[in-house]
Amino acid sequence: QDTNNLQSRILQLLRKDCTNIAVVGDDAQSIYKFRGANVQNIINFPDLFDDCKEVELVENYRSSKEILALANLSYENFATEGFSKTMNGQFSTGYKPVLMRPDTDEAANIEVANGILDLISIGVPADKICVIARKSRDLFGVEHLLNQHQVAYEKRGGQKFLELRGILDMIAYFRFASNPMDEISLFRLLRLHHGIGDTYASNICELLGIVDNPIINNKYTGFKFAEELRRLHQVFETAKTIPNEDVETKFALFEAFYSDTCARAIKLMKTDEATRTEKYEELESERANIQQLFLIAQQYHSITEFLDALILEQARVEDDKDVKKVVLTTIHSAKGLEFDTVFVLGCVDGLFPQIPIWEMGEVDDSDEEIQEELRCFYVAITRAEKRLYLVCPRTAVFYTGVFKTRITRFLDGCRNTYQESDSYIRLE
C-alpha cells in the first residue's frame, strides 16, 4: 500500500511473462502520499492483474474488541473507496476508548501527563505508553511536562523541543536579556543578522565586560550591518522597560523582532528564488514552533521562573539508554508499532483532519486529502492494544486566536463506541 507509481509499473513489467505474484497490504494504512505513495496501487490491484485471488486477513491480535469497534465504524463511515472489511479482535478489556475534553490545550497536556504518571504508578511499563500527534510540534506541551516530572521519553518523527533552532534562538533572547554577559547567547543572536558571520560575531562578543553596550560600541559602526546591530541593541533596551513578570509582552517583543530579523536576512541573501521561498517556509514553521513555546511560557509568573524551568529541562535531555521511556511520536513514525496505552492528541476538526479555517465546510469527505487523513486516524488509533485516549480540548489556539473546537468528524456516528470525560480516567 506504500508503493509509488513507478514501483507499480516495475511490478507489472516483472509479472508480464509470469503468473506467480503475491502481495500483502492494507489500503486503510496507506499514509505516505506525501512521499509519493499511491493508495490506488493496492485498490486497483485486482483490476491490473488478471485472475487475482483475494484473501482477507481480518483477525486482529493487537487491539481490544472495544478499540476495533471504534476503528471499524469510523473507517466504514468515512471511507469512500477501497476494500470493505471488519477487523475482528481476539480479546475484550471491558472498557471503551475515552474521548478526553479538557477546557484548553494546556489543560489537555496536563491531563495526558497526569495520565502517564498514573499508568506508570499502576505498573504499565513506560515504553508501552505512547503519545501520538499529527505533527511533531503538537507534542511539545506534553514533552515539556514530562521533563518537569522527570519522566524519561524518546521522540520519534521530529527533534526534541529544546533542540529546535527557532526555540533555541528565542531562548537566547531571554537569556541575554537576563544576563548581558551571556556570550553564547549573544553570539547566536548576532549570527541571525544578515552580513554578520562567525568572525564579526566573535569579535563583538569578546568586548563583553570590556566596554559598555558592545553591540553598538565596536569597530563595525561604519559597516553595512551597523543598522542591524543598532536594531538588536534597541530591542534589548525596550525589553528593559518591560517588567519581568509581564511574560506575554516580553515574549511578543522578542518573537516579533526575531521574525522580522530572519525575514530581512532571507530577503537580502544572495540565492535563487526557489531557495528563498523554501527559507520563508522554514521560517513559518519555526514561528509555529515558537507559538508552542509561548503557550508554555504563559504558564510561568515571570521570565526568571520560565528560564529556570528551561535550564532544568535542558539538564535532563541527556539520554539514559537503560531506562524505559515513554514514546512521543508522529503518526507516520508510529506505523507498525504497538503499545499498551495510546493517547492521540489534537482530535479536533480542522487539525485532524487538517483543514484550513477558511476551507471548513467546503471540503468534501471524499476529497483524497481527507481520505488520507482518515487513514492516518485509523493508523493512530489502532496502535493501541488495551487503552485508547482521544484528546480534544474544548478550545484551541489557531493562527488568528482562540476558538471553540469541534470533535474530529472521524468520530461522527461513533458515539456508542467511546466514553467521554473532561479529564483522564483510569481504565483497569
Question: Language-model segments: which ranges?
Answer:
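Helicase P-loop NTPase motor core
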Residues: 51-53, 59-151, 177-179
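Conserved helicase NTPase motor core
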Residues: 1-41, 59, 63
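Conserved helicase core region in the C-terminal RecA-like lobe
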Residues: 2, 24, 135, 192, ...
